[in-house]
From Swiss-Prot:
Source organism per UniProt: Escherichia coli (strain K12)
Region: Disordered, residue numbers: 114-138
Compositional bias (Acidic residues): 118-138
GO biological process: mRNA catabolic process; regulation of endoribonuclease activity
Molecular functions per Gene Ontology: endoribonuclease inhibitor activity; enzyme binding; protein homodimerization activity; ribonuclease inhibitor activity
Locations listed in the record: Cytoplasm
Protein's UniProt name: Regulator of ribonuclease activity B
One Gene Ontology cellular component: cytosol
Keywords recorded for this protein, A-Z: Cytoplasm
Note: RraA and RraB interact with Rne at separate sites within the Rne and exert distinct effects on the composition of the degradosome, affecting distinct sets of RNA transcripts.
Name of the encoding gene: rraB
Transmembrane segment boundaries: none
Quaternary structure (record): Interacts with the C-terminal region of Rne.
SUPFAM superfamilies: Hypothetical protein VC0424
InterPro entries: RraB (IPR016716), RraB-like_sf (IPR036701), RraB_dom (IPR009671)
Amino acid sequence: MANPEQLEEQREETRLIIEELLEDGSDPDALYTIEHHLSADDLETLEKAAVEAFKLGYEVTDPEELEVEDGDIVICCDILSECALNADLIDAQVEQLMTLAEKFDVEYDGWGTYFEDPNGEDGDDEDFVDEDDDGVRH
């Protein structure tokens, strides 16, 4: 079980991210690629968590090295999902991935996404939003 205080902090952060995106004019009806960030001190530890996330139905990016502020090197990857900009759906994913991170002793470093232009001409106007999606991947 993920730390309740950290979960609450993430819930607040989720609502802030969504609010800021919508205030900036991002499309409220778009499907968003949600990038959950994981990091670890070594590749083997991160790979175990990434494999488990993949088994749960998430896409996983290739690991890469990142130098953090104090000069240390960490190995990181993104755990990807696609969903509506819905706080409850994202909260469910965050809780699932924070629990996974705790299990494998890796860091859950939050999530992010990108602005979706409601007037964008990307030809992907047939986005499907699954109203029954509870955010948890199996």
